[in-house]
Amino acid sequence: MLDSAVLDYEIARQKATLDALPILADIARADVIYYDLLSSEQIKVLCHAQPHTVVSIYAENLKGTIHRLDKDSVLGTALLNGSRGRGTLPERNSNSQAHQEVWPVRDYMGKVIGAISIETSDTERASYRHRSVDSEWRDL
């Protein structure tokens, strides 16, 4: 059984993480999704922070939805093996792809309890690269 101080700490830590995701979505100009691992086959979206700075790659917010976990996906690898990774997804609102970066979230004992996925459209990724090149030229 968990000590009440440890439990309080874990709850506060998860709340702080979830509270920070909307800010991260705007700064990253990407959808940021926190997935909770329900079982080895199911995940639930605890938080879906859609950016205000660009158009979301999802037509609707995914918060509260339950999905089957694809064990071979980047998300599956993060949740089941504890490894962060990158991959591509078909973008929901167009014919292009979205880029996904996933980090596992661990509890105080190091057990993977969820994952944070940052999902960026091809368009926004290209725009970021363009802004980065422009910034390098200004520094010369």
PLM feature segments, named:
Residues M1, L46-P51, I113, S117:
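Short, compositionally biased low-complexity segments
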Residues Y9, Y34-Y35, Y58, Y108, ...:
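Sequence-level detector for tyrosine residue identity
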Residues Q14, Q42, Q50, Q97-Q100:
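Residue-identity detector for glutamine
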